């Protein structure tokens, strides 16, 4: 499945959703600057981590253990004995950001093909075996990484680690299997993007907002690129990027770290080491004026979406850019981080309301440049221009008047509550740790980020509202509704869209 980061996941509970940020299925800002940060794909995020001898478990955060195998693969273990279940996730630091022009969608296509067999197992056999063990499995592809998971009774962990390691090392399939699965992926694109006006609006807005950054391309790929993609293209992509030094295995649940390390050495440790390809910087050039686009499509209501280029979090150092990224995250929560927040009160409530629904998101983390998003669905009798003006007026109000300390404390309290809630889920813990690894952050980033966010001041939020919301860094997209008459009936989802 494709997974475009929901920016709100980062803004509201910080890591409540782990995508984003975590950049399942094609969520987008309805969602995934005067000052502007141009970022390139991070070439070696692990450079932030201290060197570690191979095959040695080290406690790197509260209850979190990490080891590096001889072949370069990273192992992360988070014991949680509250229920007899275990989650294994395989994270590969490759997503659509690593694709080249003409090959969009190849990372996602490879995700699908990873379920199509190995030298020993036929198509779909891995999932069937996981189900027989009483578990479930799936995968997702984002702009920044690809991840595979199995959730099983803890006693079945050895079997699923062996299955996933076999797939990682020995994935193979015939050309006719690729042809069948490509038809499934194209239908996925039609159903989730081409037939969904808001998804098309988001896709076109990203393509307009980013000129050089690989975020210009959709994770699922342009249809023309899918048409020309070959089985050998996908095999070559896998050979380049699916190497141990570009991957991490995260295991969370009712497990013993030393036993998991022994299993990892037995299963993943035998995979030969290979070099990770170099990544060329592709910085986004400075934007020098507003960009606007309209999408005319059959729809019941208009949609107005505004995105502004903003700095993303680059590590945890106290830099001006990182401070601004955190302040923008707080700003998004002030605008739309709880029931009855500023945007809802100003635009949705009351007899003179401008919108039926609103949204504010900040892209806190990612391997590429980030966006702050404002969205509104105009109310009956209101125009997109009125909705846009109302959205921008609320940001301008904060830039002019600031934010009260009590309001900030309210959203910060919600972040802490979100952190506590997240820890009840073994899957969420595994997803959070894997995403931190993939984005080059330390594995104790949640506690450090909460500490940093709690220190954000009203003055910093006001300064961010003043700094990043000018016309010259904005890309505005409007869905202009067309008649629903003669619109084709939505088609049922075909079999095979699980991945």
Predicted regions and their residues:
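M16 family metallopeptidases and their MPP-like homologs
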Residues: 78, 83-109, 123-167, 197-224, ...
């Amino acid at each position: 499945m494709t997974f475009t980061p929901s920016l709100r996941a980062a803004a509201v509970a910080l890591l409540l959703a782990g995508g984003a940020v975590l950049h399942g299925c094609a969520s987008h800002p309805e969602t995934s600057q005067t000052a502007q940060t141009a970022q390139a794909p991070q070439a070696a995020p692990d450079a932030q981590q201290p060197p570690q001898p191979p095959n040695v478990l080290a406690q790197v955060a509260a209850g979190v253990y990490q080891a590096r195998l001889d072949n370069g693969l990273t192992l992360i273990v988070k014991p949680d004995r509250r229920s007899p279940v275990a989650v294994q996730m395989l994270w590969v630091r490759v997503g659509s950001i690593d694709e080249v022009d003409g090959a969009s969608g190849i990372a996602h296509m490879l995700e699908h093909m990873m379920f199509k067999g190995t030298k020993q197992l036929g198509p779909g056999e891995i999932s069937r075996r996981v189900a027989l063990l009483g578990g479930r499995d799936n995968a997702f592809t984002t702009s920044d990484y690809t991840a595979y998971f199995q959730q099983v009774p803890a006693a079945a962990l050895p079997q699923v680690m062996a299955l996933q390691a076999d797939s990682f090392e020995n994935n193979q399939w015939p050309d006719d299997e690729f042809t069948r699965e490509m038809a499934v992926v194209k239908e996925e694109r039609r159903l989730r993007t081409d037939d969904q006006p808001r998804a098309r609006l988001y896709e076109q807005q990203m393509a307009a907002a980013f000129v050089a950054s690989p975020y210009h391309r959709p994770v699922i790929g342009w249809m023309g690129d899918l048409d020309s993609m070959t089985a050998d293209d996908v095999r070559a992509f896998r050979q380049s990027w699916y190497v141990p030094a570009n991957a991490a295995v995260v295991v969370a649940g009712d497990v013993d770290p030393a036993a998991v390390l022994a299993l990892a050495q037995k299963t993943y440790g035998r995979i030969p080491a290979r070099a990770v390809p170099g990544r060329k910087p592709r910085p986004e050039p400075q934007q020098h004026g507003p960009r606007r686009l309209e999408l005319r499509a059959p729809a019941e209501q208009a949609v107005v979406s505004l995105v502004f280029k903003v700095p993303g979090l680059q590590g945890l150092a106290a830099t001006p850019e990182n401070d601004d990224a955190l302040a923008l995250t707080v700003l998004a929560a002030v605008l739309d981080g709880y029931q009855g927040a500023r945007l809802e009160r100003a635009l949705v409530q009351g007899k003179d309301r401008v919108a039926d629904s609103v949204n504010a998101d900040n892209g806190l983390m990612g391997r590429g440049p980030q966006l702050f998003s404002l969205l509104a669905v105009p109310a009956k009798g209101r125009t997109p221009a009125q909705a846009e003006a109302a959205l921008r007026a609320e940001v301008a109000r904060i830039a002019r008047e600031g934010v009260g300390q009590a309001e900030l404390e309210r959203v910060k309290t919600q972040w802490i509550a979100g952190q506590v809630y997240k820890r009840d889920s073994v899957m969420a813990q595994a997803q959070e740790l894997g995403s931190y690894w993939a984005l080059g952050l330390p594995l104790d980033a949640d506690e450090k980020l909460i500490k940093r966010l709690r220190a954000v001041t009203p003055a910093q939020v006001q300064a961010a509202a003043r700094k990043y919301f000018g016309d010259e860094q904005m890309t505005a997209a409007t869905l202009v509704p067309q008649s629903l008459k003669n619109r084709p009936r939505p088609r049922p989802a075909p079999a095979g869209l699980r991945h």
